[in-house]
Amino acid sequence: CGKPTVFRIIHPNLRENVICANCRSINRQRQIAHVMLSNIHGGKPPATARIGEFPKDKVVWNLETTRALHDHLKARIGDNYIASEFIDPSMKSGDTRDGIMHVDLQDTHFADDSIDFIVHGDILEHMPWPEKAVVEMFRVLKPGGRTIFTVPFYRHRFTNEKRAVVDDGAEGGVRHILPELYHDDPMRPQDGVLVYNIFAPELLCDMEKAGFLPRLCQVYSPFYGILGDNGIVIDAVKPAAGQSM
């Protein structure tokens, strides 16, 4: 929000707390906002930068319809802002339920070259086919557009960790390779959502193969309430003609 504040730490996982007393944003959301602002301020946002000053002419798709980043982007961007959730696998991308749009990042309904920024926080690990999601993001982004997101990320290994796969012959249609792991999910507060993958630098190679110019950002800024050693944000651009990182 960019306002003077106090950050509250309520449990040891700094990535999921360090809560702003004003806007209720958490550490991980501010990491994404910081990288978004860095891209419009030539690499380093000024101390007073806030997401409420993001350019209104940019089409931004956020894969979340709750929490502080959504609230700020919706208030700022208006009609150019798109927010969605993964609601039900039986729904088609673009369908709505209770006023919320359902979109499967692995199979979206958006037109080619139609979006400037795609942002999401800890979403990709819940998709059984993340490589399809990477291809879809590249397809719908405009040349020069970017996807900025967080995922659980290993720094001690190169390859992604496959924890579960879709298998019609398995109980529940999912075969678990490693012990089941679930994350909290505002859409499914009782059940949570299954983790299919935990990522590693291999993800950036997969994004390069899809055509992206990706970079791994390590974000740390006590001034912005971005604490801890796990401030990892992926920032990947769909290059315009002649564009480089």
Predicted regions and their residues:
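A short acidic, Gly/Pro-enriched loop at the edge of an enzyme's catalytic core
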Residues: V103-I118
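Active-site micro-motifs of SAM-dependent methyltransferase domains
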Residues: D107, E125, R155
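A short SAM/SAH-binding and catalytic strip from SAM-dependent methyltransferases
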Residues: D116-P128
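S-adenosyl-L-methionine-dependent methyltransferase catalytic module, highlighting the catalytic core
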Residues: E131-S244
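Residues that mark the start of a beta-strand
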Residues: D57-V60, S114, K142
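GHKL-family ATP-binding catalytic core of two-component histidine kinases
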Residues: H109-A111, P128, A200
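Conserved N-terminal segment of class I S-adenosyl-L-methionine
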Residues: C1-D107, A164-D168, P222-M245
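Glycine/Thr-rich phosphate-binding loops of Rossmann-like dinucleotide-binding domains
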Residues: H70, P128, R157
